[in-house]
């Protein structure tokens, strides 16, 4: 019998230094911290999903063929160029497992989505950071294209991850800059378009011409399916085939696959929801901009980054008024800042009132 195990000693060094991901949950608070779509599913969609003949006693279709065919119609990418995952987080880790590891490196542009670095650390992939540039006068973030290309020239670099629009800043980077990095880097370029439906911009149309381009998308944001964990990668069949070698079998459950197929039939309804959320976010941004002490950063997503004089106080007082937003800690180039996404219109009305009382 083992009385005591030295777990820290047995852990891989790259895991030993990591902190477990924690999501905050406060009862009776309006959740504006996770960039979700708060609007209900389109009428009839839930009934259609629950009425589907799903064999819960059987393993799901390991190839998610019906879903990939629906995604092919939606994106214009052939089904053999599509890989589905248990949320984008699984796909990010799959990318690091396949093309990273202890002899590989990835280039990222902080501040950006934290899971890129987390997945890299778990897999022992080296992380090279090329921070964004900040134009203080316009409060716009920019890619350091030359810096990214210089970092990517190092032989151990296999991947570059570009988040567009970027989380947490909301920045939409110019298409020509992204395509220049794809063309000149000679490395795998992953463009995370989780919020692409809100910006209306995409580089998916360039996949036929760029064998090193992967575009990652999700059903968690506009399609309001965060609870079902469904993401997908788009690329040329050769690179998707390589990733399939390391993919876990049956990684997307039958219920989520069917939900994705059905959701894609409601494109017009979801597009209207996107317009509503963007208009609501603009209303919140306008209210924040009225306060000279608050920096509001430009956004092309369904969330915004802002910086009051005392972020910690604003965060805590909003909780006291029934609103949970995201405290971003000390962001590179920015310092302490807060991020919020939109609630329902009536919730946003209350939020604007609460912000006015706190910031006055």
From Swiss-Prot:
Pfam families: Aminotran_1_2 (PF00155)
Record has Lipid metabolism as a keyword: no
Entry-linked SUPFAM superfamilies: PLP-dependent transferases (SSF53383)
Keywords: Amino-acid biosynthesis, Aminotransferase, Histidine biosynthesis, Pyridoxal phosphate, Transferase
Pathway involvement of the protein, from the record: Amino-acid biosynthesis; L-histidine biosynthesis; L-histidine from 5-phospho-alpha-D-ribose 1-diphosphate: step 7/9
Reaction catalysis annotation: L-histidinol phosphate + 2-oxoglutarate = 3-(imidazol-4-yl)-2-oxopropyl phosphate + L-glutamate
Record-given protein name: Histidinol-phosphate aminotransferase
Any one GO MF annotation of this record: pyridoxal phosphate binding
The protein's required cofactors: pyridoxal 5'-phosphate
Residue positions where N6-(pyridoxal phosphate)lysine is found in the record: 221
Keyword Amino-acid biosynthesis carried by entry: yes
NCBIfam families, sorted: hisC
EC code(s) of this entry: 2.6.1.9
Domain of life (superkingdom): Bacteria
Signal peptide: none
CDD domains assigned: AAT_like
